[in-house]
From Swiss-Prot:
Quaternary context: Homodimer.
Species per Swiss-Prot/TrEMBL record: Shigella dysenteriae serotype 1 (strain Sd197)
Function in brief: Involved in the anomeric conversion of L-rhamnose.
Keywords, sorted A to Z: Carbohydrate metabolism, Cytoplasm, Isomerase, Rhamnose metabolism
Organism lineage: Bacteria, Pseudomonadati, Pseudomonadota, Gammaproteobacteria, Enterobacterales
EC identifiers of the protein: 5.1.3.32
InterPro entries: Dimeric_a/b-barrel (IPR011008), L-rhamnose_mutarotase (IPR013448), Rham/fucose_mutarotase (IPR008000)
Keyword Zinc: no
Enzyme class at the top of the EC tree: isomerase
Protein name, as recorded: L-rhamnose mutarotase
Catalyzed reactions per annotation: alpha-L-rhamnose = beta-L-rhamnose
Broad class of the protein's primary localization: cytoplasm
Length: 104
């Protein structure tokens, strides 16, 4: 398994709405994530800094990257643009983090 972590932002007035939209996520999106090898996906909110920290275990980079081209992911990204900063393709603005420590 490959561990990935990344940081995104959420709009200051959208914390509750962001959480509402993720509890639960659309069943179709959950199915796509799982079918593309995503496991143990978690997102944490730092309310003071409007930051989202996400962590996911994936089976392969290729399968993980393929999620972005699915119709359901494209719809989800568009759905989320009013609660978080987005790139021109509607994907969330994010920065991948480098793992510096892991305790199995």
């Amino acid at each position: 398994m490959i561990r990935k972590a990344f940081v995104m932002q959420v709009n200051p007035d959208a914390h509750e709405e962001y959480q509402r939209r993720h509890n639960p996520i659309w069943p179709e999106l959950e199915a796509v994530l799982k079918s593309h090898g995503a496991h143990n996906y978690a997102i944490y909110l730092d309310k003071a800094r409007n930051l989202l920290f996400a962590m996911v275990e994936i089976e392969s980079e290729e399968r993980w990257n393929a999620v972005a081209s699915t119709e359901i992911c494209q719809r989800w990204w568009k759905y989320m643009t009013d609660v978080m900063p987005a790139n021109p393709d509607n994907s969330p603005v994010s920065s991948e983090l480098q793992e510096v420590f892991y305790l199995p």
